[in-house]
A protein has these predicted regions:
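Amphipathic alpha-helical linker/stalk segments
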Residues: 29-33, 38-39, 67-95
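Alpha-helical DNA-contacting segments of helix-turn-helix folds
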Residues: 31, 59, 64-73, 114, ...
Length: 207
């Protein structure tokens, strides 16, 4: 008796996801290999080895291509054991160093993301949500701080925990991923310690 083996093709949804990721990786290669000036839907299609129509089915504009890159990085971050959107300052503290190490594992994608977001003055929705989460966590931890000081601290700490800080410390500063992670971790902890001191002083002054 001859056994009939059934060939199971990938599901349609998985095939779509694979194509989408292939296109996203093509964005990375276009930006890093050919330059930001070459970042067009057509060039991404050529780099991915797919038709312009195929790209258009997934992403209709450059901004949507960048959203796709951001979503790809978010999926990687979601697979880690640290919180991606902090609820407390402890979440921020435990996130910084592991996040920097994770960025180093997908450094080309992070480099492309930072280059394009800065050059095009663009940021994705999740980045904005994380910024608001940082502000809420810091405000809850240091309720006596004047709003001006809190905003300044939030902006700096948010930057230190970002892809842009990783880029500045590694690509521009020449640190390896481990050293960059230590530097950012130290800076965030130092700032929180100082904010605690200032918050206590403000509370005492008001009592």
């Amino acid at each position: 008796v001859t056994e009939t083996r059934k060939y199971r093709s990938p599901s349609r949804e998985q095939a779509k996801a694979d194509t989408r990721e292939k296109i996203v990786q093509a964005v990375v290669r276009v930006v890093l290999d050919d330059g930001l000036h070459a970042f067009t839907v057509q060039n991404v299609a050529l780099k991915a080895g797919v038709s312009h129509r195929t790209v258009y089915r997934h992403f209709t504009t450059r901004d949507e291509l960048l959203d796709g890159l951001a979503e790809s990085l978010d999926r990687i971050a979601a697979g880690s054991t640290v919180p991606t959107t902090p609820e407390t300052i402890d979440d921020v503290i435990v996130t910084v160093a592991p996040s920097f190490q994770a960025m180093g594992e997908v450094r080309d994608a992070v480099r492309a993301y930072v280059i394009t977001s800065l050059a095009l003055n663009w940021q994705d929705d999740n980045r904005r949500k994380r910024t608001l989460a940082f502000d809420k966590a810091i405000g809850a931890a240091f309720p006596q701080l004047p709003s001006k000081e809190r905003r300044e601290a939030t902006a700096l700490i948010r930057h230190l925990a970002s892809t842009r800080a990783w880029y500045a410390l590694t690509v521009e500063g020449g640190l390896d991923d481990a050293a960059a992670a230590r530097a950012a971790d130290w800076a965030v902890r130092t700032l929180f310690k100082d904010l605690g001191r200032r918050d206590r002083a403000a509370a005492k002054a008001r009592s």
